[in-house]
Amino acid sequence: MDKKQSRLRRGRQTRAKIAELKVIRLAVHRTNLHIYASIIGPDAKILASASTAEAEVRKELAGQSGAGGNVAAAALVGKRVAEKALKAGIAEVAFDRSGFRYHGRVKAVAEAAREAGLKF
């Protein structure tokens, strides 16, 4: 089993546990260039989302080297998704890291979302 298959397996296990609880989750996906965060309801509908691919985020990150793929950009995405969730009336979520290690950009999204008022 290679690294990608292992990550996908871990992600499936996490999603299965969250699905049993029927709670809203904050799902994070990471690529080399961007990071994506979505608030997903128990019925698999996306309630709020933010990413470094959004035009508003790109404007805020303009001028930085590696603008979409760094910890500062991930923190901005975490803050934005938390603000959108709170505006939609969502205060508590389960964190779905999609099999990625809780380190670096994934950790930055989670910590920024917590600081912005989202409870895990």
UniProtKB/Swiss-Prot annotation:
UniProt-recorded Gene Ontology molecular function terms: 5S rRNA binding; structural constituent of ribosome
Pfam families (alphabetical): Ribosomal_L18p (PF00861)
Claim: Ribosomal protein is one of the keywords in the record: yes
Mitochondrion is among the record's keywords: no
Any one Gene Ontology cellular component term annotated for this protein: cytosolic large ribosomal subunit
Record-level GO BP terms: translation
HAMAP family for this protein: Ribosomal_uL18_B (MF_01337_B)
PANTHER family associated with the record: 39S RIBOSOMAL PROTEIN L18, MITOCHONDRIAL, LARGE RIBOSOMAL SUBUNIT PROTEIN UL18M
Family (UniProt): Belongs to the universal ribosomal protein uL18 family.
Role this protein plays: This is one of the proteins that bind and probably mediate the attachment of the 5S RNA into the large ribosomal subunit, where it forms part of the central protuberance.
Quaternary structure and partners: Part of the 50S ribosomal subunit; part of the 5S rRNA/L5/L18/L25 subcomplex. Contacts the 5S and 23S rRNAs.
Protein name as annotated: Large ribosomal subunit protein uL18
Lineage: Bacteria, Pseudomonadati, Pseudomonadota, Betaproteobacteria, Burkholderiales
